Amino acid sequence: MSEVKQEIMQFDNCSTIIVGKHASKTGHVLVAHNEDDMECITQVHLVPRVKHEEGEVITFKDGSAVIPQVPETWAYMWTELRTLKGIGGEPFADSYCNEWGVAIVTDSCVGSKVSEDEKMKDGIGYALRRLIAERAKTAREGVEVAAALCSEFGYRSSRAYHICDKDEAWVFQATTGHNYVAQRVGDDEIYYIPNWYTIHKVDFTDTEHKNFYWSEDLVAYPMRHGWYTPAVEGDYSDFDFALAYQHDLTLGKSNADRSDLAWTKLVGEPMPYRTFSVKAPKKYGIEDLKEVVRSHYMEHGDDLKEDPTMSPHRFGICRDTTSVSEIIEFHEDVNLSCCWRSFPRPCAA
């Protein structure tokens, strides 16, 4: 079995739902996330603001980047997952919500294409989410923090970062290397992701970044390696980020089943695989999102006819690997924002 396929199979469990503020019953963005990592325990920490000395730098064990520290880092709530076996934690499993009401949850998109000359064993990995929480006052500023760090130091995995505040929700999708793209979820839209890239068309005329950010080499890089060729030379309107950068192996049964299940629960029918978002057919509340993150896969009833011991968690959104489920309910007053949390599986809450 290839290294890429093994990695995809290991991390194809998480789910994230985002509801735009005009599609939400609360009038603010809603975020729901199931974090799936086997044999983990979850700890929640409150980290205060910290002032730093001039010239101070920060490093992380999973990368070689030496990152200049800012004068002051913001306070945040840190949901940390740590393994029950061995030493250390799950470095790509943690989530954050800071004192300004900026929340970060992520989903693996393991399987991005990368050339031999761009393989990153160092750069930034786990550090990215924490640095966003420490440095951003808004979701948009969080995207800009992530973009600057990935451009300078490179990113060593493939991941979707969901960076949200009460008014805006952004999806920042990083590839292995120095490329990334970010798209804003529309205020009247609903978004779901299992573990694949979901950003497709990029509006390269959006130089004011109302809805998109992108790396300088985003299009040229896959062109150099034969992953994308424009139909008309010099016209990149047919560029599709997910298709250019994503391995087909991510279209596995686990991802496909969760996509079908989530979209059916949310809008009444499955959506094409790798859909980014759709116009919300109704307004969604906390209870709607709880129902989705608790969902077991649709064929379970049929399986029970053949095997009464069949687990409902195999290909569901709520799985036997789910370590923590979170729903973030933003409020106009950040002190009244609420994080609903279940340990471990949400179907038990």
Model-derived features: where do they sit?
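Short, charged, surface-exposed loops that flank catalytic or proteolytic processing sites
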Residues: R135-E141
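Substrate-recognition/cap regions that form aromatic- and gly/pro-loop-enriched pockets
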Residues: D302-A349
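Second-shell loop/turn segments in exported
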Residues: E118, L128-R135
